[in-house]
Structures are given as C-alpha cells and as structure tokens.
Design a protein with these regions (language model features):
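Alpha/beta-hydrolase fold nucleophile elbow
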Residues: 204-212
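Gly/Ala-rich beta-loop-alpha elbow adjacent to hydrolase catalytic centers
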Residues: 213, 217
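Alpha/beta-hydrolase active-site loop
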Residues: 179-199
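Substrate-access "cap/lid" subdomains that shape
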Residues: 197, 231, 241-359
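Non-catalytic accessory segments of hydrolases
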Residues: 10-13, 28-182, 206, 344-347
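Short glycine-enriched nucleophile-adjacent loop
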Residues: 218-229
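Alpha/beta-hydrolase-fold catalytic nucleophile elbow
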Residues: 159, 212, 238-241, 342
Length: 360
C-alpha cells in the first residue's frame, strides 16, 4: 500500500474488519433500567477511573496482572494486587520495556486500555495486539475511539512483555516440568482472561471476543490459533499482515546464551565467554537468580532489531507446551472464524535487504 501511513492502514483495516465482524445490529438492546457505562467503572480487582474523549470513554493502563519484576521476570503472569480507591486510568501507561533508539518503557507493563461508549451493552469485543517484531511497540498503536463510536464494539489494546523478557528459552527459565519460554503468549492469555471476567462492566460481551493484531501482533494471533492454551479464550480472529513462523526453543537458547555470555563475564559469573555460554545452557538456579538481577537495559540491548525468519531474535517457540512443534500440521487450529488482511506492498522494504529476493 503505497503512500499510506502505518496508522492509516491500521485504522482503515480495523474499520473494514469491524464492519464485517461486528455489524451494528449485533449490539443487544439494553434491558430497561440498565445503567450507562460510566468513566468510573468496577473491575474484579478494584474501581478504575477513565475519562471521556469526545463521544467515547477510555481507560488507560488497567493492570491485568502483577508486575513481572524481580524473581517474576520470567514467570507466568500472576494476579495483580487489588485496590479499594479508584485507580487513575486517565493517562497512557508506559510501554513494555524495549530498546529502539534508546531504552524506553517499564517492566511493570502488564496493562491494557479499554475504549467504550456510555450506551454500550453486550457489544462485541475487539482485542488488539500491536506490531513491532515482538520487540517494540505499545497499546497506543491503534486508538480505539473511532471504532467504538462508529462500529459497535468495545475495543481493548494491551501491552505485554517484549524482546528477551517476552521470549526466552534458556533452560534455567523454562524448567522441564512443563515450563515455556513463550512468556508474551502467557501474558496475552492472561489479558484475555481479564477481558472475559471484566468486560461486561464496560459494555462488552464476554462471550463474543475477537482477537486481532498487526504484523508481529498478527503473527501472535496466528500462534494463538494453534495453541491449546487459548482454547475457548476468543471466538473470532483477525490477522493484519500476520503470518506464522515458529522457532526451535533449543536453537534459540543457544543463540540467547551466546548473546548474554558477555554480560555474565562482565559480572564475574564465568571466567570467559565459552564457559558462560555453556553455563547459561544449564538449568542451574544460580543462572536464573543472576538473570533476574541484571538491569533490563543490558538484557534488551543484546538482541535488537529482529530480521526475517527470526534470524536475529528467534521467538514463538514450538515447545509442545504453548505451541505445537508441528505448527499448523499438528491439527490443533481452533475452529473460529478468521479474517486475514494484508497490504499490497507491505513486504517491499524487507525484500530490499534479504538475499533471497532478487531485484529486477
């Protein structure tokens, strides 16, 4: 799609997808006496205070899980601590920790944004996963105001762990008793649970959830379609510019160990990088303890800027825990309606720098 911005493409595609998936007639009539959705809204963990923007309401940065910090850095997301007083959700929350031109964001990132309108009742819910190679991006990539005002849905966009915080298959972080390095997918599953348990208070229908995403987010949607973990967690799917590429967790662990070995030597954990490489590939609890203590900027900077075929940053591990080793061939694809969207020239920039594609 030439001469069109990323956000324009997303907005146009999202509007078209919403029109197809959520006809305005899909919204059930509210029973007599039903209260309007308010900017002060209850959740199972405590009340959240949003704000009006034009004709819609928005709540930014609602916690759907506890902060994955310290020893929880590479663990499944846990329940957030509840609160009693209204939580201020009137300003955008920081992005998940990431490195672009400079480090930005926070590890306390397991938060989501909700957009709705006061009159919403049992509306279809569109959950959106942002793009960015699973290394960059945030929940603000696609604002949902136009969608909820014009297309009859409630819109949810979420942040989840990125880079080596979201995908890390080192043995010390993925014990053999069913552990997985697909932490970002665990975050997405947890966010979908939050939506199912809380979205009715925002005017959404918890039994009518569409999972959508753009680019890396679209690939995550396709991964969720194959994962037994996501059975029953959503009813429809939309992938914008997404594909399906899984990686070998063992090969990825070797690549991650090589990337992190210099840090282990710097911190005096091993005598040299060869010893560090070997040590990082063991399930030693001391490896986990050290990794959880390292400053996030040092970790995030070790594997920047993902490339085609995941050659720089392998992720979406086919570990037979969250994702089947056989991919689509495993026959575990969830039988839900799937809408695929793409741009006519979206791959051109990637092809310029990839040896598999010859220029004419």
């Amino acid at each position: 799609m030439e001469n069109i911005s990323r956000r324009t493409f997303l907005k146009s595609g999202a509007a078209a997808a919403a029109a197809a998936a959520f006809p305005l007639s899909a919204e059930a009539a509210a029973p007599a006496g039903t209260a309007a959705v308010s900017a002060l809204c209850p959740t199972q963990y405590g009340p959240v205070q949003g704000k009006a923007q034009g004709s819609h309401l928005v709540w930014y940065g609602i916690p759907y899980a506890a902060a994955p910090v310290g020893d929880a850095r590479w663990r499944a997301p846990q329940e957030p601590t509840g609160w009693t007083n209204p939580l201020d959700c009137t300003a955008p929350a920081p992005a998940a920790y990431q490195v672009s031109s400079a480090p930005i964001g926070t590890e306390d990132c397991l938060r989501l944004d909700v957009y709705s309108v006061p009159s919403a009742h049992s509306r279809p819910v569109l959950v959106y996963l942002h793009g960015g190679n699973n290394q960059t991006g945030d929940s603000l990539e696609l604002p949902g105001g136009d969608l909820v005002e014009n297309d009859g849905c409630v819109f949810v966009s979420l942040n989840y762990r990125l880079g080596l915080f979201g995908f890390n298959s080192l043995p010390a972080l993925c014990p053999e008793d069913g552990g997985t390095g697909n932490f970002a997918l665990l975050d997405i599953a947890k966010a979908l649970d939050w939506v199912r348990e809380n979205i009715s208070a925002f005017g959404g229908d918890p039994a009518n959830i569409t999972l959508s995403g753009f680019s890396a987010g679209g690939r995550n949607v396709m991964a969720c379609l194959t994962s037994p973990l996501f059975a029953g967690r959503f009813q429809k799917a939309i992938s914008f510019s997404g594909g399906i590429t899984f990686s070998d967790p063992d090969a990825a662990a070797r690549q991650i160990a090589a990337a992190l070995a210099p840090l282990a030597v710097e911190d005096g954990r091993f005598a040299d990088e060869n010893a560090a490489f070997a040590g990082l590939l063991t399930p030693d609890a001391a490896v986990r303890e050290w990794l959880c203590s390292v400053e996030p900027s040092r970790i995030a900077s070790r594997m920047p800027h993902a490339a085609l075929r995941m050659s720089v940053f392998p992720h979406l591990y086919a570990d037979d825990v969250v994702l089947p080793k056989a991919g689509f061939a495993a026959g575990t694809l969830h039988q839900v309606p799937l809408l695929l969207l793409t741009g006519s020239t979206e791959f051109s920039a990637f092809a310029l720098y990839d040896g598999w594609f010859a220029s004419e």
